[in-house]
């Protein structure tokens, strides 16, 4: 009788531990992982001011990319950014005309003197990429793209920052070392 009571007590303890272990695994599997963007990219932008105390912008499936209505070049920029984000994170972001609201906003203007300069400002509600020309906004998109980590199935935290950048030289060049690193034709185009 005593042996049976001890056996029942041990069984209850083991069942309780198994239940707690399963509950722990269930809680961990529901946890949403967030990866953080890194603004230390090449080429390094001219000015980077990170706001350490401010909340980051969370790039998730519900994020929208907005551009000025009626501007086809900016629409192409927005679609280009959406395709890059999909390749990097697997997230399909909606692209829509307009520049009001929460999300990633592409706009013309800003205080960049160079036509290829841009300003990238990240707050908890918005990522605003502005430039005096569509080319400037395009280069701002490149900075944002390089900052986003390759991470499928997780949200991306973009730390609050203000980046002002412009080309140091009047020309842009690139070299493809295809003898050691082969590139598909689509990526070269």
Task: Tell what function each PLM region has.
Residues 1-40:
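Bacterial Sec-dependent N-terminal signal peptides
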Residues 2, 70, 180-181:
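A generic structural signal for short
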Residues 30-169:
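Acidic, contiguous N-terminal accessory segments
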Residues 160-189:
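An acidic-aromatic substrate-binding cleft motif
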């Amino acid at each position: 009788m005593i042996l049976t009571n001890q056996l029942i007590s041990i069984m209850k303890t083991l069942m309780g531990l198994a239940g707690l272990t399963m509950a722990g695994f269930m809680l961990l599997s529901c946890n949403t992982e967030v990866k953080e963007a890194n603004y230390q990219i090449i080429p390094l932008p001219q000015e980077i001011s990170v706001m350490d105390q401010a909340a980051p912008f969370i790039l998730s499936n519900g994020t929208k990319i907005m551009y000025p209505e009626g501007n086809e070049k900016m629409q192409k920029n927005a679609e280009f950014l959406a395709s890059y984000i999909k390749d990097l994170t697997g997230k399909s972001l909606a692209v829509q005309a307009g520049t009001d609201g929460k999300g990633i906003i592409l706009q013309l203007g800003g205080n960049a003197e160079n036509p290829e300069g841009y300003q990238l400002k990240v707050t908890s509600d918005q990522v605003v990429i502005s430039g005096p020309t569509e080319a400037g906004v395009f280069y701002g998109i490149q900075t944002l793209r390089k900052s986003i980590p390759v991470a499928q199935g997780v949200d991306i935290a973009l730390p609050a920052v203000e980046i002002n950048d412009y080309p140091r030289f009047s020309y842009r060049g690139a070299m493809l070392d295809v003898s050691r690193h082969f590139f598909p034709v689509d990526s070269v185009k």
